[in-house]
């Protein structure tokens, strides 16, 4: 009995110690008198996420509540004290000027048990730096020009399928068909595979891409645990990727690589770049260790390129059409520009013609301001950092750093009438006057979005093809204002985007 009493006492003391430590962690900012909200015991400052609030709403509400109080507000990333940036000058320091102190994103990854988590977006340290350097060659202007005819080829099929949908019903849900377009583009450009999702909405590539983006392997409690105790989660062999998506993308990459190497096929695309990395050393660590890219690492890069590329571009195009349907004068101006430019290039959409569609670019940039697909940028502090001019505000080593770019894009101090769709915000004159960190849909600095050029190319070509042939208007099924999905980290419409479509 005495032994059991001692063991019980030890357990009680241990639990009490852990609860005390837990409580102290959740009062970190209050004890320093830094503005913050009272955190939830499990979710921290993410109370209601995926149930009653979208991620986007959380960043927006927090930013609007505390802006003007200091360079940042205290924020609890689940159980971890972190910061939410409130000042654009601090964002610039973190992303550009002091980048060496904030190079990592701090997201969970477990390459041993969850190989697709070893993607560029999640990698840290020297391995991220080496991988980024190698992959950058895939997204040069020359590579984009080479891929452009493929984009246009898929685009013509897209227009045909879109027209068929309109003939069946003048009310078209545009989000899904746009995602099928970008799925086929990326599948062809990255894998050299005909995905056929335009013809078949239930094609395997489309289904797996959709599931990888919108389905979670864990519920809110599991996500909170993984993000709060990353090292323990790795010891417990926890994964974040859906099992089916993992098997699918590993299989596709293995089969594609084997076929190309056996038949000596080169397509000068993303997969070729990965094959080159597989067959040449990649510096992996600070010690200078060099290794070849494995099939699993190749699959991870292909996975993020596919998943991020099809969803972000299709979402941007969908929201652009949503706004153009509400602003017929702007839509008419874009159409006039597209028709004039296409006429100038003998009725063809070419890589060079895209550069002449200046107002279309402004529409896309303004859409990305109002509907920032990734509404927050994540970083992790690598060493204690005192905010210049604010000795009270210190970011400790290991703290999560959140830059709520979606909320900043709707700040009236940065953009007049910030909730109004106005492509003139991105006229050449205004862009020259604006600091680059005041527009962050692709991030900024050395860790900006590596696929930015590809995403913009998809959006430009897809919208130019559509607007040249179709007129878009709102209808009874159009949700105004838009309601965001609560289930995904990226912004997307909860109910789809329904628009009335007519041929021009």
From Swiss-Prot:
Membrane topology: Peripheral membrane protein
Keywords: Endoplasmic reticulum, Heme, Iron, Membrane, Metal-binding, Microsome, Monooxygenase, Oxidoreductase
Cofactor(s), names only, from the UniProt record: heme
Gene Ontology CC: one annotated term: endoplasmic reticulum membrane
Entry binding sites for heme: 449
One MF annotation (Gene Ontology) recorded for this entry: heme binding
Record family assignment: Belongs to the cytochrome P450 family.
PANTHER family: CYTOCHROME P450 (PTHR24292), CYTOCHROME P450 6A16, ISOFORM B-RELATED (PTHR24292:SF100)
Protein name: Cytochrome P450 6a9
Organism the protein comes from: Drosophila melanogaster
Lineage: Eukaryota, Metazoa, Ecdysozoa, Arthropoda, Hexapoda
């Amino acid at each position: 009995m005495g032994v059991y009493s001692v063991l019980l006492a030890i357990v009680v003391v241990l639990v009490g110690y852990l609860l005390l430590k837990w409580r102290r962690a959740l009062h970190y900012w209050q004890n320093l008198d830094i503005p913050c909200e009272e955190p939830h015991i499990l979710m921290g400052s993410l109370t209601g996420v995926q149930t009653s609030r979208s991620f986007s709403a959380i960043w927006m509400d927090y930013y609007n509540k505390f802006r003007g109080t200091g360079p940042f507000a205290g924020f609890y990333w689940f159980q971890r004290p972190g910061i939410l940036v409130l000042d654009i000058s601090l964002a610039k320091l973190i992303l550009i000027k002091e980048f060496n102190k904030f190079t990592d994103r701090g997201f969970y990854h477990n390459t041993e048990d969850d190989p697709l988590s070893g993607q560029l977006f999640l990698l840290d340290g020297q391995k991220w730096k080496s991988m980024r350097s190698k992959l950058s060659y895939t997204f040069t202007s020359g590579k984009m020009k080479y891929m452009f005819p493929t984009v246009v080829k898929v685009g013509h099929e897209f227009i045909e399928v879109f027209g068929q949908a309109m003939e069946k019903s003048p009310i078209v849900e545009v989000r899904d068909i746009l995602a099928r377009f970008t799925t086929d583009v990326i599948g062809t450009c990255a894998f050299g595979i005909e995905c056929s999702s335009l013809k078949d909405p239930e094609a395997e590539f489309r289904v797996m891409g959709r599931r990888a983006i919108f389905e979670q392997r864990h519920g809110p409690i599991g996500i909170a645990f993984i993000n709060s105790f990353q090292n323990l989660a790795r010891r417990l062999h926890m994964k974040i990727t859906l099992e089916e998506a993992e098997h699918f993308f590993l299989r596709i990459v293995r089969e594609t690589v084997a076929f190309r190497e056996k038949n000596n096929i080169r397509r000068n695309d993303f997969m070729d770049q990965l094959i080159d990395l597989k067959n040449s050393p990649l510096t992996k660590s600070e010690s200078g260790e060099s290794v070849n890219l494995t099939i699993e690492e190749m699959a991870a890069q292909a996975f993020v390129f596919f998943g991020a590329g099809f969803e972000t571009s299709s979402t941007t195009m969908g929201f652009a059409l949503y706004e153009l349907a509400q602003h017929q004068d702007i839509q008419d101006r874009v159409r006039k520009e597209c028709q004039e430019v296409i006429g100038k290039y003998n009725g063809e959409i070419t890589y060079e013609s895209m550069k002449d569609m200046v107002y279309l670019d402004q529409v896309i940039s303004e859409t990305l301001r109002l509907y920032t697909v990734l509404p927050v940028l994540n970083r992790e502090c690598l060493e204690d950092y005192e905010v210049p001019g604010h000795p009270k505000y210190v970011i400790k080593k290991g703290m999560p750093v959140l830059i709520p770019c979606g909320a900043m894009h709707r700040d009236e101090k940065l953009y007049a009438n910030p909730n109004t769709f106005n492509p003139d915000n991105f006229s050449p004159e205004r862009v020259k006057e604006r600091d680059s960190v005041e527009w962050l849909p692709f991030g900024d600095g050395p860790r900006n979005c590596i696929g930015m050029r590809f995403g913009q190319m998809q959006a430009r070509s897809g919208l130019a093809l559509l607007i040249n042939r179709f007129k878009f208007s709102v209808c009874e099924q159009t949700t105004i204002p838009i309601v965001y999905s609560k289930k995904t980290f990226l912004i997307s419409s909860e109910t789809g985007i329904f628009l009335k479509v007519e041929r021009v």
